[in-house]
């Protein structure tokens, strides 16, 4: 039985920080957004959680839809819940981290006009609060 709430609901999204080794350190996978908000800006692969999927399944689906990459093992990194982090409204993002092999092939699709690997030391300007997300991810992987 469905229940209708009388108060506004938050939106739930997932993002994937995917890292691969490179000659000069690590690289992170980013997509160029095809649609507003932040059309044409670089961002982490991610999107909205469907009602019939788990958070990790949503992260894997969004990663595959936007980059063609399959990463079996994703680990929850952090929940980002800043009140004004998304211009579309109140949005909570659960971020996952995973690793890809050096020769991993990617191909932009769905909401991404392109996808590419970037050195942590040469990141483009990022959409949303993804600079903070990557700062946290970099600290996490340096502690391994």
What is each of the regions a protein language model found here?
Residues 49-73, 78-141:
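Unchanged
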Residues 1-43, 56, 71:
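N-terminal strand-loop-strand
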């Amino acid at each position: 039985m469905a229940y209708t709430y009388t108060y506004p609901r938050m939106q739930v999204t997932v993002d994937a920080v995917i890292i691969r080794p490179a000659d000069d350190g690590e690289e992170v996978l980013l997509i160029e957004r095809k649609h507003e908000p932040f059309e044409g800006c670089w961002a982490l692969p991610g999107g909205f959680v469907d009602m019939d999927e788990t958070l990790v399944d949503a992260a894997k689906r969004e990663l595959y839809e936007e980059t063609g990459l399959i990463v079996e093992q994703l680990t929850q990194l952090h929940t980002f819940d800043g009140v004004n982090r998304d211009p579309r409204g109140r949005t909570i993002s659960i971020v996952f981290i995973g690793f890809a092999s050096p020769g991993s092939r990617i191909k932009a699709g769905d909401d991404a006009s392109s996808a590419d690997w970037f050195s942590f030391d040469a990141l483009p300007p990022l959409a949303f609060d993804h600079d903070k997300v990557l700062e946290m991810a970099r600290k996490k992987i340096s502690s391994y």
